[in-house]
Regions:
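Catalytic palm subdomain of template-directed nucleic-acid polymerases
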Residues: 71-74, 78, 83, 93-95, ...
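Charge-lined substrate channels and their catalytic hotspots, especially those that engage the 3′ end
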Residues: 1-81, 88-134, 165, 172, ...
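Conserved catalytic alpha/beta cores of large enzymes that bind or transform nucleotide phosphates
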Residues: 108-216
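Short, well-ordered loop/turn elements at secondary-structure boundaries
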Residues: 49-50, 63-64, 73-78, 104, ...
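Structured core elements
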Residues: 53-55, 67-69, 79-83, 89, ...
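Append "with occasional cross-activation on large, charged helical scaffolds in nucleic-acid assemblies
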Residues: 155, 170-343
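Short loop/turn segments at secondary-structure transitions that flank enzyme active sites
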Residues: 2-3, 62, 87-88, 116, ...
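Short, flexible loop/turn elements at secondary-structure junctions
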Residues: 57-60, 72-74, 84, 114, ...
């Protein structure tokens, strides 16, 4: 029916060549895959089901493709695990599922609606790291020293069982309880997260150490005014709010970056074919526009050279964080960056 949310989504999908319905042969292959893990056919795997592994996502997440775990050793070192759903065990090369996933390339998300890259039997079922269910995973197991530096890592095929379906805003409330939070509210949250409650401060501790290291090498945290649409039960937008990033969002982002860093290092060490995402230095014209933005905000930034270093830009970001001029300055720096390219 014209004018409805469903009609609008259907029109957008059609215009962009995205199909909401899977071919019969793809659905047939998906439906034939058991919804319980069969360890007998899963090959040699490291059994991590006794480890305190759990997912952390937004409260509207429906599929869970990554989970984390952390242990602190007696010598002050950390054992960090990032566990990714092992989709490749079920989607074999050149199969109907593989060909359709390749054709789609990605899942397409609308507020309250998703067109998955794989049928829901996989994306929300056997390939989703659902709470309390055994799942096959590909795990990056990292050892970090007392300062948060990576000392060693390994990649293994594993079988895991997520203990808790974590939610960002709930974990943020546990890590940094807001003044409005009552003891009863926190008691309920502590009950839900009882199995992993002791891990959360340790995760926060490691994240803070990683943050210090990232700042030292000029890592840039750019704040933006990302919006979130609030939908009612009928799929209609009833509000637009600022999407806030709390400690847990930043923490998980850092842990995923660590796993990516290990993967890139493994690829380089083994001289494996790899796709690199490259950010080149800003050009002079964009720097002139940035300087104009900074002057308009009352800042007279003194860079040593026409093209500032990453450390100089990172210092400018930190200097304006939390200030009234944060958004224009951070947005100006973001726009001064070259678009990423793949090589």
């Amino acid at each position: 029916e014209n004018g409805t949310m469903e009609a609008s989504i259907a029109a957008i999908l059609h215009e962009n060549g995205v199909f909401d319905v899977f071919p019969d042969e793809v659905l047939k292959q998906a439906d034939a895959i058991p919804q319980q893990v069969d360890l007998a056919s899963a090959g040699k795997r490291l059994d991590l089901r006794d480890k305190l592994i759990f997912t952390i996502d937004g409260d509207d997440a429906k599929d869970f493709d990554d989970a984390v775990s952390l242990e602190k050793l007696d010598n002050g070192h950390y054992l960090l695990g990032v566990h990714i759903a092992d989709v490749s065990h079920y989607v074999t090369p050149d199969s109907p599922l593989d060909s359709e996933a390749f054709r789609r390339g990605t899942s397409v998300y609308f507020p309250g609606h998703v067109v998955p890259m794989l049928p829901f039997a996989l994306s929300n079922g056997i390939c989703s790291l659902n709470e309390g269910e055994d799942r096959l995973a590909f795990s990056c197991l990292m050892r970090l020293d007392e300062n948060g530096e990576i000392r060693s890592y390994k990649f293994v095929k594993s079988v895991i069982c997520s203990r808790v379906k974590g939610v960002y805003k709930e974990i943020n409330a546990l890590l940094e309880p807001p003044e409005s939070e009552t003891d009863a509210d926190l008691t309920d949250l502590k009950t839900k997260y009882e199995a992993v409650l002791d891990q959360l401060p340790t995760m926060d501790e490691l994240y803070r150490k990683r943050l210090v290291l990232r700042k030292a090498r000029g890592g840039m945290d750019i704040e933006s005014n990302e919006a979130k649409l609030v939908m009612d039960e009928n799929g209609r937008c009833i509000d637009i709010v600022k999407r806030d990033r709390g400690t847990s969002e930043c923490m998980i982002e850092e842990f995923m970056l660590l796993a990516n860093q290990c993967a890139a290092n493994a690829g380089r060490t083994n001289k494996a074919p790899f796709v690199y995402r490259v950010h080149e230095a800003p050009d002079a014209e964009k720097m002139e526009k940035l300087s104009a933005t900074l002057l308009a905000c009352g800042l007279n930034a003194k860079f040593k050279n026409p093209i500032p270093t990453q450390l100089e830009l990172a210092a400018l970001l930190d200097e304006t964080r939390g200030q009234p001029i944060q958004i224009p300055v951070h947005t100006g720096i973001l726009r001064s960056m070259q678009k990423a390219r793949y090589a």
